[in-house]
Amino acid sequence: ELNDEFSGAKITPRVIDGKYKYKHNFLWDFCSLIFQNILSMPIKIGYAKFKFKIKYIGKEKIKKYKKEGYFVYVNHTQQFADTFIPSIPIYPKRNFFIVNPENISVKPFGTIIEMLGALPVPGNKEAMKNFLDIIREKIEKKCSITIYPEAHIWPYYTGIRPFKSVSFKYPVELKKPTFCMTNTYQRYGKKNNRLRIVTYIDGPFFA
């Protein structure tokens, strides 16, 4: 099964049908913006810096598209950090990420994750229409959409794994640029016994 969720736990997934609200009112969206791009950013940056000594190579490629919406594909190697590793070099552009329903199924954390930018995969045709509409809307508003196309979270793995080609339909249909972020793990320290994340940014790619 080429799907996964960030939580790492067995959770009864929330039903994402036509009643699920992908689009919210102004107040909800404003609070999401504050939470996503202001209040949480120091935590994201601090965690990435002190836990992983993260380094990004190729940030200038993304900066050239700061006035345009685009898609980002990332390898899936961290449960928690994967939710924000792409957001740091993309900032201050708002970054949304596609997740499985399990990620928003535990209250009250599900709402928090939604406000941080999670867009759950739809469960039926009616929900799919709303899902595609919100992706189109976010891209038109010059936001970015992050997709983890690989199967399961394999911690610290840097090889290429199989993934569903259907995950690439979004940039093809919307004719928008696509970037790739590849998280690698490199040793450092006096005894070469510590690991840091070095993220390589490539693109843009066009269909």
Model-derived regions: residue spans:
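A transmembrane-helix-recognition feature enriched in membrane-embedded lipid enzymes
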Residues: 7-58, 108-115
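Soluble catalytic domains of membrane acyltransferases
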Residues: 53-207
